[in-house]
Amino acid sequence: MIVSRFIIKLKTPLHCGGGESLFLDGPVSRDPFGYWNIQGSSLAGVLRASLREIDKDLADSLFGFIKGDLSKASLVWFSDANLLDFDEKRACDKAGNGENVEIKTDSYIRDHVHLQEEGLNRGTSVSGHKFDEEIVPPGAEFAFELKFDEWQYSSDDVQKEKEKFLLLCKIIASSQVRLGGKTVNGYGCFETIYAQYHEVDMRSEDGITQWLNLDNDVCFTSSDAIDIEKDATIVPSKEGYSFDISIPLQNNSMFLPGGVSAKEEDVGTDITCLTTPVLNYKNKTKCIDVYTATGSSIRGAIRHRVFEICNALNLENSLAIEIFGCEADESSKQGKAGLVSCDDAYLKDIKSCVMPHVKIDSFTGGNVDGALFYENPLCGNIGGNIEFDLHMEGRKLTLPQLKILAHALLDLCNGELAIGAGCNKGYGFFKLKGLGEDIKENLSKITLHLFKDGTLLDLSKIDIRESLLSELENA
């Protein structure tokens, strides 16, 4: 028997669906005490899907299968991932024992609007399709454990199955999966801050005694616990091209990532910038509201540019649809998940400024009576710049898809693609930080890990940036 325990910390919002609600379109899952949680079935589903992309037989061996008359039980047991209080104890345990729980699990909402699939160059919304969803804020910490039970194996086969289970643990420790739904919009990204396992021999009397005396704390207290190593080269897909890229962007003008702001200085303003609540366990404080460029907004801007590139090159729109996915078709009733995801960008130490506007009558050229409104775009920090790192991940891409996507990212780096609202006023045009005349020099500032068929490409031997640049010039 192997028991592994983990503590994870959310880097982006999490949305694990919690059924229906009278007041919310998409509530999150909560335990009986009302605290956020991630169900064990959700953890098992994500990790099984990840293993199936690495090795289908490996996934069937650990998680079991049913194939006609053949079947096999799962060897892995999952607990729910329980929310931790600021003292690193399970909030549900403290509530059950009548102890005071400091962390507040209010309802945090994000609004969305559905965009038309046809006429993508317009990017217009569909009437009556505004919806909201509840999120678990970044910074929240959860604890859970996995158990490996090799009861149906002989001692000769146990070592093989143990290695498979430890690979599964390594995937979690390396934060190589995303949890919950909406992952293409950057949700569900986490970092593992604790990962250890403890092994006991259930075939011996001493092992059974160790098992019975094993503590139920969040972390192991025994010195026999072994650290689970991390491996950044694990990729959940061995098909096509996969990548993760981080691009430092900079803007010296206004930026308007529209949404609901919880900051006091934005109260009463007609158009505000979105804020995201972020938990801070170190200072044991309630959520701090941070201005945010959402992953869905960044991904949407890149998506539209990819469609424009396809149209300009007389390529089929199906190339772009395969990259970003599509909703269910009325005839086939089948949708398609996207292959790329973008994380939220949190804009710290950024201030907003009040910009008054008045609607102009196009016939008289004068102002329309009573049509004065205000907006609060972001105007940068003390240095006057707005900076953030764009983080994007992709999987199972073909080479043509990779080239088209690289073309759109180059447009973004060159200040030719806007993010957020107000682009007709010059808002939201970012450039690669420190962009100069030498495009090759500035491309080297981008952090890129590229995999082909599951193998990490050595960029010191294969100048993939040079190759992409050459392909784009030829296109």
Q: Can you say where each PLM-predicted feature lies in the sequence?
A:
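Small/polar/charged residue-enriched interaction surfaces, especially the RNA/DNA-contacting tracks
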Residues: M1-A475
